[in-house]
Structures are given as structure tokens and as C-alpha cells.
Amino acid sequence: MKIALIAHDRMKEQIVQLAMAYESILAKHDLYATGTTGSRIMEATSLSLTRFLSGPLGGDQQIGAMIARNEMDLIIFLRDPLTSQPHEPDIIALLRLCDVHKIPFATNLGSAEIMLKALELGQLDWREVVREENEA
């Protein structure tokens, strides 16, 4: 599965802690992240991942391009709900694309943990079927 890890500035420590706690699960998948988030995760874990630009500089859109091609299977985007984000339209576009392509989108620590536990149990394997249907 291809998983994107994204976090707003005030949430970066939480996503690093999440990656550390679920490293054994995440290590079995192809990981992608926006710039700073990816750097922080790689510094704290032994996970390898593909890093895109920082979110406000286009990293969200790079991940969005993969979503538009139905090349992502899970998005974990720990958002800061209390701070206005200048790239909010990009975030809304990601959410919309995930809805179009039936890609799970976790926006907080609770939903991210549930998704990762479901991933471990094989409960997101249906994504492979959805991907194949869209390729046909």
C-alpha cells in the first residue's frame, strides 16, 4: 500500500510519535511525505520514504497528483484545526480527491491510529480491488 504522511507545523511532533509507535506496520508499505514532515520522520525512525516539497510550496499538490491517478491508498494528514492555513484550498482539494477515489483520509491522531490498526489487520486490502477497477 502507498501511504502519505502529512502534518501541519504544530502537529509534526504528533506524526513523528505516530510513525515511531507504528513503525513496524509502516515499514511494510511505500511511504510518502511532504518535505519537513518526511525529514523529521526519517530522523526519528528507520523508515524510508519519498519526500515531496513542503506542503505550502506544492508538496500537497504533488501528493494530490498521485491521488488523482489513484496511486495512493491511505492519507494521514494531521491537521492543525486552530490555525489558519494559507494553503487551505490545497487541503480541501486533497480531501475531495480522496472522496472521489475512495481513499481513506485520517485527519487526527485517533483516526490515524484506527486506520493503521486496520491496515495491519488487512482491512484496507479492498483498496487493491478499487485500484484495479479504476485501471480497467
From Swiss-Prot:
Keyword Lyase: yes
Family of the protein in this entry: Belongs to the methylglyoxal synthase family.
GO cellular component labels: cytosol
Disulphide connectivity of cysteines: none
UniProt entry keywords in alphabetical sequence: Lyase
Alphabetized CDD domains for the sequence: MGS
Residue ranges occupied by any MGS-like domain in the UniProt entry: 1-136
Binding site for substrate: 8, 12, 34-37, 54-55, 87
GO terms of biological process kind: methylglyoxal biosynthetic process
Organism name: Brevibacillus brevis (strain 47 / JCM 6285 / NBRC 100599)
Function summary: Catalyzes the formation of methylglyoxal from dihydroxyacetone phosphate.
The keyword Lyase is assigned to this record: yes
Enzyme class, first EC level, given as a word: lyase
Full protein name: Methylglyoxal synthase
Active-site positions on this chain: 60
The enzyme's E.C. designation: 4.2.3.3
